[in-house]
Amino acid sequence: MFKIFVKINAIKNISAILIFSLLLLSCEDNDSSIKEIVNSDVEWQFTNIDDSVLDLELLKSNLSELIDSNYLRAIAISYNDQLIFDHYKIGDADKRYPVYSVTKSVLSAAFGKLFDQELIENENMTIDAFLNMYDYNDPEIKSTISVKHLLSMQSGIQDDVNYIRSDTPIKYILDQNLLYAPGRFWNYSSAGTHILSAVFQKITNENPESFVKKHIFDPLEITNYFWEVDANGLSNGGWGLYLTLHDMIKFGMLFSNDGKWNSDQLISQSWVNRSTSKMRAFRSGSGSWEYLPDNEAGYGYLWWINTVGDNEVFSALGYGGQYIVVDKTRKLVLAITSKESSSISYRRKISSIVFNDLIPIFPAAPPSNN
């Protein structure tokens, strides 16, 4: 059985940054009141692990580099399904943190549940099966956009985050010209994932937030969360989710265990494997790829994938330095939340420490009966 723990102790451009900042200030219940009161004292207490398993002094040394940063809010690590460390530099165990594009990976999990329940036939279904494309400009080409294109960031939809300020956000997005024919190139687009949210609602007659609550969050006992909506009340598919640090860990643990939580298969193993497999490969480590180390990275279905040693590791990543990193071989999950104002150098430091220093010191987890 998993130990459910309570321990008391778009990555894009300047315009996107401004929009995100406005959202933080304007949303009714967005936790913009996060108090920037810094806790500089670190209690170096590692639980559920000892020196016979891991060099704890080396772990402490690597963690210290992150914790000393002015941008870090909180960090937690679980190993072999148990929390071994957490630290709150800003906030506490009850604080909901904005996780930005980590939201996309949660939406991906929700789509996995749709496929598991056979509510959608396959990923190649085009969005004109769910949305009347003749309500928008250039319906012929946009009718060829598939669910797979949207899940893998290959739809050609522009990454214009101003949709969240529109009274008609879906029309705002789909009236714009495509950057390229669907399926031709990879291009990160929060607007595209908001179209996914609209497709999801059409399939289920339910807001993604409500569906996720019933089928994923409730079984994980995730109750202290918030999900922003657009002008029409639709869950924002691009960003907008707020989670506690431990709930970020829980979501990662669900995927580290192939979609299983306790005795319940919440999401099929086949979807976990498919959604965290590379649909597109590209070189990271420069420009906007400061969130991942400088190696051959890739993108799955709203998950980022890169290699650590011989293992593929996948991550839910959010603007400013929000991370849920999962290494299934090690049964290792790291959750990191950072200030939105974090610098590129800070995010590159996270990338280097997490993927080059922290993860490799953990051994593969022993076989589990869970």
PLM features: residue spans?
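C-terminal motif of bacterial Sec signal peptides marking the signal peptidase cleavage site
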Residues: 23-26
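Bacterial signal peptide processing site
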Residues: 28-30
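Active-site SXXK
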Residues: 81, 97-123, 150, 196-200, ...
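Active-site helix/loop module of the DD-peptidase/beta-lactamase fold
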Residues: 117-153, 175, 204-239
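Conserved catalytic neighborhood of penicillin-recognizing serine enzymes
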Residues: 134-163, 181-182, 191-192, 243-246
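Active-site Gly/Thr loop motif
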Residues: 222, 276-333
